[in-house]
Amino acid sequence: KDSRDINPVHDLILPFTRMVAGPMDYTPGAVNNATAEDFYINFVHPISLGTRAHQAALYVVYESSLQMLADSPSNYYKAPEFASFISRIPTTWDDTKAITAKIGEQLVIARKNGKNWYLAGLTDWNARSIEVKLNFLEADKYKMEVFKDGVNADVYASDFKTEEVIVSKGDSINVTMAKGGGWAAILTPIE
């Protein structure tokens, strides 16, 4: 927030370095987001590089049994959808599946807690769409609540979209991310 060095590329190096030995401490959850072109250092109202959805995805990607909110409490009151979504992401996991990853470039991971699955993707400064086959799911059908980059996230990094869809075990979905973006989902079995 006070350096250009803490950016989406950096975020995609940490799972391969600091997290190799186990959980790590980090401060995701920034509400003030900027593209590389719009970023400036602001000590009064800190800004993070990358999209709001990138920040949401970090809660699933980074393993930390004591997660935190990195921003001012006032900012979470102004962003209730974001605050509500990240508050539902657990801090411990029963299972983890690495779907795809390339250090410093992109990553998609699935984690399980109880009966729910949590899916997240991160990208560097390149927009990308990654096809993910949901063959790791156990139940037949799931409600998938998605927090993803909005259509304008490539120029306004705080733009996001939420949606709910029904998916089935074995379906293929596209994890589409803006430059510096992210994608996160909570999958709850339908019984």
Residue ranges and their predicted role:
Residues 146-170:
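Solvent-exposed beta-strand/loop surfaces of large extracellular or lumenal domains
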Residues 103-142, 183-184:
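Carbohydrate-binding surface patches
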Residues 72-73, 121-123, 134, 146-148, ...:
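Active-site proximal loops enriched in glycine and acidic residues that flank catalytic Cys/His/Asp
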Residues 164-191:
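C-terminal beta-strand-rich structural cap/linker in extracellular carbohydrate-active enzymes
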Residues 71-118, 154-158:
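Glycan-recognition and catalytic regions of carbohydrate-active enzymes
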Residues 76-82, 125-126, 135-152:
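Active/binding-pocket-proximal capping segment
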Residues 31, 66-67, 115-116, 124-126, ...:
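Short, glycine-/Ser/Thr-/acidic-enriched flexible segments
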Residues 1-73, 99:
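Glycan-recognition surfaces
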